[in-house]
């Protein structure tokens, strides 16, 4: 018997009603895994545990620690409403100010702009001693040594979405690819 090319076999498939139903159910299940706010949707990377929404947060993800790190990381997706939450530049400055170098001055930050699915996105990458835990209303300001912050601001049709991924530098580095997956999954809903 002569081998038959795969595409020839695929074109001869007959989809039964049961196969069609299973296909639709699988597509619906995949879309339910996507989260959304402000006219945008995204999909969290596998291995990141969703902790759901919190006040001012559309989503929060817990990331397990990398080998050698005592603490895990957190990725928060913020949405404050149309025209709320401050400008892109104001948020970049605030995030830069939360990370300091060994000299106590704000740490250097890499800022980049790109487009993902026709959405303007500005990213920040900075490392150092992190003093942004607990948010601006925290009673005390504890500082976490050797942390890294990857952030992104996605300019959506109903307002900006702010993504802030913070944690021990090694844990964030081990999950940088997953953070990129998260960013690349953002699209209009």
Where are these regions (language model features)?
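Surface-exposed amphipathic alpha-helical segments
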Residues: 12, 40-42, 48, 157-189
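Signature of long, low-cysteine stretches enriched in small and polar/charged residues
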Residues: 46, 56-58, 92-154
């Amino acid at each position: 018997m002569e081998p038959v090319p795969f595409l020839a076999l695929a074109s001869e498939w007959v989809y039964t009603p049961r196969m069609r139903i299973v296909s639709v159910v699988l597509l619906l299940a995949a879309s339910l895994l996507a989260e959304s706010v402000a006219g945008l949707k995204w999909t969290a990377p596998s291995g990141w545990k969703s902790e759901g929404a919190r006040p001012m947060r559309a989503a929060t993800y817990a990331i397990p620690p990398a080998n050698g790190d005592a603490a895990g990381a957190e990725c928060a997706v913020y949405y404050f409403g149309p025209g709320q939450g401050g400008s892109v530049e104001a948020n970049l400055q605030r995030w830069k100010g939360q990370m300091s170098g060994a000299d106590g001055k704000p740490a250097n930050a890499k800022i980049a702009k790109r487009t993902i699915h026709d959405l303007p996105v500005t990213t920040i990458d900075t490392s150092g001693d992190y003093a942004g835990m607990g948010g601006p209303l925290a009673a005390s300001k504890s500082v976490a040594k050797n942390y890294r912050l990857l952030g992104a601001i996605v300019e959506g049709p109903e307002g900006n979405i702010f993504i802030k991924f913070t944690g021990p530098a090694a844990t964030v580095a081990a999950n940088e690819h997953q953070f990129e997956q998260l960013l690349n999954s953002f699209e209009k809903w």
